[in-house]
C-alpha cells in the first residue's frame, strides 16, 4: 500500500512537472523576439569615452556629467586608468600628461623619458607625480582640432573613486592600457583594481595585454566585472606574447579563456579601401558571437572624417554597426554619446516607409549635392530616392536662351569649364560681383551640355572632400528635363525654381528668364492646378511680383542677409508678393565663435503673419555646425524643427533630414535628453567669459527698404553673336572689360608648349 501511494505521488509530481515545463515552453514561445542580434539580445551599450570627450576635456567632471545628462539611462562611463607615484588610480587618457593637461605649465622641468613597450618615450608621466602633486593640474583638450574654450575652466584630475561617487554611473568601465609599464616601475594595477572594487562598482575592465588578464583571473569572484580584451592595430604586437593582434584575432577560442568580450577598432568589422570607401563587412561579429564573446567597437567620433558612404552623417555610421540586417555589435565606444544614444534608441529598426512623427518640408539645394555634382541627373534622382519632398532648380540661361539647372551663373563654380577650350570666354562683370568668370550666357546650351559637372567642396581647405569617386559624375539638366523628372515622381510634393539675376539678363544680355521659366512650365504640362506644387523663389521682390502677375504659382521670398529681426511693415510688404520666406540659419540662431548666443523672433513673427519659413543651408559636415549641435547634423535639424519650429529645411543632404521625420523618439510623450533641442546660449554658460574676444556688431534688422525694388526692366535687343567656339562678343557685358585677348594668348602659348613637350 505504501509503495502504491509512493508511486501515485511520483506520478502526480511528474504530471505537475510536465505541466510546468509545458507552461514555460509556451511562455517562451510567446516571448517576443529581440530585434537586436547582439550576443544577449539586449540593445548595444553606449560607452562614453572619458565622458562627453568630443566637447569637454577628456575625463573631466563636465565631460562625465554631460555624458550622463545627454545619453541613454544605462550609458557606460569609460575611464582610462593611470597610476600615480603613490599607486592611486586616476582617470586620464594616456600615460603621458602633456597633451591633455596643464602639467607642463605647472611643472616645466619634470619631463622624463622611459621605454614604453620597447619604444623610448619622453613626457610627463603619471608615475612621477603623487596625487597631491596633481591637485593644481587641470585637464584640457587633448585633440587640438577641438574647441579650446573649455580649457580655461577648472577641470581637476579625477580619481577612479571620485568618478564613481560623484557621477554614480549606471555602468563603469575601466580601461588598463599599460599594465606592463606600471609593473616595470613596481606599481601593481591589479592590486589597485582589487582594492578599488571594494568601494567602487566596476562593471567592465579592458586591456590590450594578455598577461594582465592572467594576473586578475579569479581575483574578483563570480560576480566580478566583465573582462574585455582590447585589440589594437592588426599589425601591432601584443607586448606580453609577442604576437600580432591579427594573429590573436584568428584564435577567438583562446581569447574566450580569459575574457568575455573583445573591443576592436571599426576597421576590424567594416574595413575601408585606400579612398575611404567601405569594403564588405568581415565575419568578426558573427564569429565572436559563436565563440560566446561580446563585441564592442571603438573609434566613434562626430568630428572626424568618416567613410564617404556615410555622407558625413554619424548616425548612418552607427546604424551600419547595429542595424544592418546581418549583425549588431554589443556596444559602441564614442566621444559623442548623445549621437550614439539617438542612433540606437531613435533611428534603429526604422524602415523608410515608417510612420512620420513630424511634418516639415525637406527641400533640396541643387538636389543631393552633398553626394553628387549639384543639379545633375544623379543628384536629383538620389534626392528623390532619399525622401526629399521638394527638389529645386536654380535656373540659368544659355546664350541661346535655354533654361537649365545650375547652382551658379558662373560655370566655373559647378563644372570643369576652365579646363576646356571655352576658357577663352572669361569676362568681367561687376554687376555679378566677379573679377573674371565664364558665364552661362557665354555658351550655347549645346556647348554647356559638353561640360563635365564638378561636385561642390565647401570645406576643401580642411581636406573634407565630398564623394571623390563621383566628383564629376552625372549630366547637366535642362529645366524641361528637371520638370519632367519631378512630374513622373510619385513621392515628391513639389518643385522649387530659383530665379536670380533677372534684371541683368534682361538689360545686358537680352534674355528673359521669367518668360523662359513660365514657357517651360507650360510646355512640360504643369498648370496652376497641377498635383506637383510649383514654388518660385527669388531674392528679388521684383521677380516675384512679375511671376505673380503672370501665374498662380506659389512664390517664395529669400532673405540672403543674416538678420536679427524683421519689421512688421517689412513683413506686410513681403506678403503682397510672397507666400513663404526663406531665411538663413544664423537669422534663427545667431552664432559667435561657433557658439549659439540666442534665438531671434524672426521665425515667430513671419509665421504669425501666415508665412511659412524655410531655412538654409543645412549640410552634414561637422564644420558647418556650431558646437551646440555636437558635430551632428541630426541634432542641428532637431533644434531647428522642434526648437525653432521652422516649416522646412533646405539641405544638400536630403537623406538625413528625411530620416529625421521617422524619428521614433518624437512619438513619445516626454522629450528624452538626447532628442532635446539645443538651448540657445546654454553651452556658453560653461565657457569662461575671458575666452571670448569683444562681441561683434549684431546682425541688422530687415526693413521695408530692404524689400522695395523697382520693377524689372524690359528686355533689350540682343547684340549679334559670333559663331560657337570662337571668342564671343555676346559674353561681354557692356560695362565689363573682356579678358579674351589675354586668354587667347595664354591658350596659344599652352598649345605651343604642349607641342614642344611632345617632340
Swiss-Prot record:
<protein>
    <recommendedName>
        <fullName>Glycerophosphodiester phosphodiesterase GDPDL3</fullName>
        <ecNumber>3.1.4.46</ecNumber>
    </recommendedName>
</protein>
<keyword id="KW-0319">Glycerol metabolism</keyword>
<feature type="glycosylation site" description="N-linked (GlcNAc...) asparagine">
    <location>
        <position position="647"/>
    </location>
</feature>
<dbReference type="GO" id="GO:0009932">
    <property type="term" value="P:cell tip growth"/>
</dbReference>
<feature type="glycosylation site" description="N-linked (GlcNAc...) asparagine">
    <location>
        <position position="353"/>
    </location>
</feature>
<feature type="domain" description="GP-PDE 2">
    <location>
        <begin position="360"/>
        <end position="661"/>
    </location>
</feature>
<feature type="glycosylation site" description="N-linked (GlcNAc...) asparagine">
    <location>
        <position position="540"/>
    </location>
</feature>
<comment type="similarity">
    <text>Belongs to the glycerophosphoryl diester phosphodiesterase family.</text>
</comment>
<dbReference type="GO" id="GO:0005829">
    <property type="term" value="C:cytosol"/>
</dbReference>
<feature type="domain" description="GP-PDE 1">
    <location>
        <begin position="44"/>
        <end position="344"/>
    </location>
</feature>
<keyword id="KW-0812">Transmembrane</keyword>
<feature type="glycosylation site" description="N-linked (GlcNAc...) asparagine">
    <location>
        <position position="413"/>
    </location>
</feature>
<dbReference type="InterPro" id="IPR017946">
    <property type="entry name" value="PLC-like_Pdiesterase_TIM-brl"/>
</dbReference>
<dbReference type="GO" id="GO:0006629">
    <property type="term" value="P:lipid metabolic process"/>
</dbReference>
<dbReference type="GO" id="GO:0006071">
    <property type="term" value="P:glycerol metabolic process"/>
</dbReference>
<feature type="glycosylation site" description="N-linked (GlcNAc...) asparagine">
    <location>
        <position position="186"/>
    </location>
</feature>
<keyword id="KW-0472">Membrane</keyword>
<keyword id="KW-0378">Hydrolase</keyword>
<keyword id="KW-0732">Signal</keyword>
<feature type="region of interest" description="Disordered">
    <location>
        <begin position="702"/>
        <end position="734"/>
    </location>
</feature>
<feature type="compositionally biased region" description="Polar residues">
    <location>
        <begin position="719"/>
        <end position="734"/>
    </location>
</feature>
<keyword id="KW-1003">Cell membrane</keyword>
<feature type="glycosylation site" description="N-linked (GlcNAc...) asparagine">
    <location>
        <position position="424"/>
    </location>
</feature>
<feature type="glycosylation site" description="N-linked (GlcNAc...) asparagine">
    <location>
        <position position="488"/>
    </location>
</feature>
<feature type="glycosylation site" description="N-linked (GlcNAc...) asparagine">
    <location>
        <position position="242"/>
    </location>
</feature>
<keyword id="KW-0961">Cell wall biogenesis/degradation</keyword>
<dbReference type="GO" id="GO:0048765">
    <property type="term" value="P:root hair cell differentiation"/>
</dbReference>
<feature type="glycosylation site" description="N-linked (GlcNAc...) asparagine">
    <location>
        <position position="99"/>
    </location>
</feature>
<keyword id="KW-0677">Repeat</keyword>
<dbReference type="Pfam" id="PF03009">
    <property type="entry name" value="GDPD"/>
</dbReference>
<feature type="glycosylation site" description="N-linked (GlcNAc...) asparagine">
    <location>
        <position position="528"/>
    </location>
</feature>
<feature type="topological domain" description="Extracellular">
    <location>
        <begin position="28"/>
        <end position="738"/>
    </location>
</feature>
<dbReference type="GO" id="GO:0005886">
    <property type="term" value="C:plasma membrane"/>
</dbReference>
<dbReference type="GO" id="GO:0071555">
    <property type="term" value="P:cell wall organization"/>
</dbReference>
<feature type="glycosylation site" description="N-linked (GlcNAc...) asparagine">
    <location>
        <position position="326"/>
    </location>
</feature>
<keyword id="KW-1133">Transmembrane helix</keyword>
<keyword id="KW-0325">Glycoprotein</keyword>
<dbReference type="InterPro" id="IPR030395">
    <property type="entry name" value="GP_PDE_dom"/>
</dbReference>
<feature type="signal peptide">
    <location>
        <begin position="1"/>
        <end position="27"/>
    </location>
</feature>
<dbReference type="GO" id="GO:0008889">
    <property type="term" value="F:glycerophosphodiester phosphodiesterase activity"/>
</dbReference>
<dbReference type="GO" id="GO:0010053">
    <property type="term" value="P:root epidermal cell differentiation"/>
</dbReference>
<feature type="transmembrane region" description="Helical">
    <location>
        <begin position="739"/>
        <end position="759"/>
    </location>
</feature>
Amino acid at each position: 500500500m505504501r509503495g502504491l501511494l509512493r508511486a501515485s505521488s511520483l506520478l502526480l509530481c511528474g504530471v505537475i512537472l510536465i505541466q510546468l515545463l509545458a507552461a514555460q515552453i509556451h511562455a517562451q514561445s510567446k516571448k517576443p523576439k529581440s530585434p537586436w542580434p547582439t550576443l544577449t539580445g539586449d540593445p548595444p551599450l553606449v560607452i562614453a569615452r572619458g565622458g562627453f570627450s568630443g566637447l569637454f576635456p577628456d575625463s573631466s567632471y563636465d565631460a562625465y556629467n554631460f555624458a550622463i545628462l545627454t545619453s541613454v539611462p544605462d550609458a557606460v562611463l569609460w575611464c582610462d586608468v593611470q597610476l600615480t607615484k603613490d599607486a592611486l588610480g586616476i582617470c586620464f587618457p594616456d600615460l603621458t600628461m602633456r597633451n591633455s593637461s596643464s602639467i607642463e605649465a605647472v611643472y616645466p622641468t619634470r619631463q622624463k623619458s622611459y621605454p614604453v613597450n620597447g619604444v623610448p618615450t619622453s613626457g610627463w608621466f603619471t608615475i612621477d607625480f603623487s596625487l597631491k602633486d596633481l591637485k593644481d593640474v587641470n585637464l584640457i583638450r587633448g585633440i587640438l582640432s577641438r574647441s579650446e574654450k573649455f580649457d580655461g575652466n577648472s577641470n581637476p584630475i579625477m580619481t577612479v573613486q571620485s568618478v564613481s561617487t560623484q557621477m554614480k554611473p549606471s555602468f563603469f568601465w575601466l580601461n588598463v592600457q599599460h599594465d606592463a609599464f606600471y609593473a616595470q616601475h613596481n606599481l601593481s594595477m591589479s592590486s589597485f583594481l582589487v582594492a578599488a572594487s571594494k568601494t567602487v562598482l566596476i562593471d567592465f575592465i579592458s586591456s590590450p595585454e594578455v598577461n594582465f588578464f592572467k594576473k586578475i583571473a579569479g581575483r574578483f569572484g563570480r560576480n566580478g566585472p566583465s573582462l574585455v580584451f582590447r585589440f589594437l592595430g592588426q599589425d601591432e604586437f601584443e607586448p606580453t606574447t609577442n604576437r600580432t593582434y591579427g594573429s590573436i584575432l584568428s584564435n577567438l577560442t583562446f581569447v574566450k579563456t580569459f575574457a568575455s568580450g573583445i573591443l576592436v577598432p571599426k576597421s576590424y568589422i567594416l574595413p575601408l579601401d585606400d579612398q575611404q570607401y567601405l569594403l564588405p563587412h568581415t565575419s568578426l561579429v558573427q564569429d565572436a558571437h559563436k565563440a560566446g564573446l561580446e563585441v564592442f567597437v571603438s573609434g566613434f567620433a562626430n568630428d572626424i572624417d568618416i567613410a564617404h558612404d556615410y555622407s558625413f552623417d554619424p548616425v548612418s555610421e552607427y546604424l551600419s554597426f547595429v542595424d544592418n540586417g546581418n549583425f549588431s555589435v554589443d556596444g559602441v565606444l564614442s566621444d559623442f554619446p548623445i549621437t550614439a544614444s539617438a542612433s540606437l534608441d531613435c533611428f534603429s529598426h526604422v524602415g523608410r516607409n515608417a510612420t512620420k512623427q513630424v511634418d516639415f518640408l525637406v527641400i533640396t539645394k541643387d538636389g543631393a549635392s552633398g553626394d553628387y555634382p549639384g543639379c545633375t541627373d544623379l543628384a536629383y534622382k538620389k534626392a528623390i530616392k532619399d525622401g526629399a519632398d521638394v527638389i529645386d532648380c536654380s535656373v540659368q540661361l544659355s546664350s541661346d536662351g535655354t533654361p537649365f539647372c545650375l547652382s551658379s551663373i558662373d560655370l566655373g563654380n559647378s563644372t570643369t569649364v576652365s579646363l576646356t577650350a571655352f576658357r577663352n570666354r572669361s569676362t568681367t562683370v561687376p554687376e555679378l560681383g566677379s573679377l573674371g568668370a565664364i558665364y552661362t550666357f557665354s555658351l550655347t546650351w549645346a556647348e554647356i551640355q559638353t561640360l563635365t559637372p564638378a561636385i561642390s567642396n565647401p570645406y576643401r581647405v580642411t581636406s573634407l572632400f565630398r564623394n571623390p569617386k563621383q566628383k564629376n559624375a552625372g549630366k547637366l539638366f535642362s529645366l524641361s528635363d528637371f520638370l519632367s523628372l519631378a512630374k513622373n515622381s510619385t513621392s515628391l510634393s513639389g518643385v522649387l525654381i530659383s530665379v536670380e539675376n533677372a534684371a541683368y539678363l534682361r538689360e545686358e544680355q537680352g534674355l528673359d528668364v521669367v518668360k523662359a521659366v513660365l514657357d517651360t512650365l507650360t510646355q512640360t504640362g504643369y498648370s496652376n492646378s497641377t498635383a506637383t506644387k510649383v514654388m518660385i523663389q527669388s531674392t528679388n521682390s521684383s521677380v516675384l511680383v512679375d511671376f505673380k502677375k503672370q501665374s498662380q504659382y506659389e512664390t517664395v521670398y529669400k532673405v540672403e542677409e543674416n538678420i536679427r529681426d524683421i519689421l512688421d511693415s517689412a513683413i506686410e510688404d513681403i506678403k503682397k508678393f510672397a507666400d513663404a520666406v526663406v531665411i538663413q540659419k544664423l537669422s534663427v540662431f545667431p552664432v559667435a565663435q561657433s557658439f549659439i548666443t540666442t534665438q531671434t523672433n524672426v521665425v515667430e513673427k513671419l509665421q504669425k503673419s501666415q508665412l511659412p519659413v524655410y531655412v538654409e543651408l543645412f549640410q552634414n559636415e561637422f564644420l558647418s555646425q556650431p558646437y551646440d549641435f555636437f558635430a551632428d547634423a541630426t541634432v542641428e535639424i532637431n533644434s531647428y524643427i522642434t526648437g525653432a519650429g521652422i516649416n522646412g529645411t533646405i539641405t544638400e543632404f536630403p537623406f538625413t533630414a528625411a530620416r529625421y521625420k521617422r524619428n521614433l523618439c518624437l512619438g513619445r510623450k516626454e522629450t528624452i535628453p538626447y532628442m532635446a533641442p539645443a538651448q540657445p546660449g546654454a553651452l556658453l554658460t560653461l565657457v569662461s567669459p575671458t575666452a571670448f574676444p569683444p562681441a561683434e556688431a549684431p546682425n541688422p534688422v530687415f526693413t521695408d527698404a530692404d524689400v522695395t525694388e523697382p520693377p524689372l526692366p524690359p528686355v533689350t535687343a540682343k547684340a549679334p553673336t559670333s559663331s560657337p567656339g570662337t571668342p564671343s562678343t555676346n559674353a561681354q557685358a557692356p560695362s565689363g572689360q573682356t579678358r579674351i585677348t589675354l586668354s587667347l594668348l595664354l591658350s596659344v602659348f599652352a598649345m605651343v608648349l604642349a607641342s614642344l613637350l611632345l617632340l
